[in-house]
C-alpha cells in the first residue's frame, strides 16, 4: 500500500481572503515504511505573505522567484497519484489544494 504524508504552508488561514499555498511537502510510505521518495516545493503565492511570515519564516523576497502552483500542479498530482494521503488537519490542506486547482 502506498501512502503519502503531506503538509502545506500558506499565507494565511482563509481562502476567502485570497490566501494561497506557499509550500507543499510530502514523503512516501510503502507498506508503512518510509522510502527515499519525497516531494517538496516552495511556491510564489502571487500576493504578500503578511503576518504568516512569523509562523513559517518564508518571506516575500524568498518566494518571489519560485514557481506558481499552476506551474507545478501536474508534477504534484503525479507524486500523489494512487496514494492514500495522510494529512494532519486534512480539511485545511485539502481545501487549499482544491482551491489552487480551481484557479
Positions of PLM-derived features:
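Conserved non-catalytic scaffold segment of RNase H-like nuclease domains
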Residues: 1-103
Amino acid at each position: 500500500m502506498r501512502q503519502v504524508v503531506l503538509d502545506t504552508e500558506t499565507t494565511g488561514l482563509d481562502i476567502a481572503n485570497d490566501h494561497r499555498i506557499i509550500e507543499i511537502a510530502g514523503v512516501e510510505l510503502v507498506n508503512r515504511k518510509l522510502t527515499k521518495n519525497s516531494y517538496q516545493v516552495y511556491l510564489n503565492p502571487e500576493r504578500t505573505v503578511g503576518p504568516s511570515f512569523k509562523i513559517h519564516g518564508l518571506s516575500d523576497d524568498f518566494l518571489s522567484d519560485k514557481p506558481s502552483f499552476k506551474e507545478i500542479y501536474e508534477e504534484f498530482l503525479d507524486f500523489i497519484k494512487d496514494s492514500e494521503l495522510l494529512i494532519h488537519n486534512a480539511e485545511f490542506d485539502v481545501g487549499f489544494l482544491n482551491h489552487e486547482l480551481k484557479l
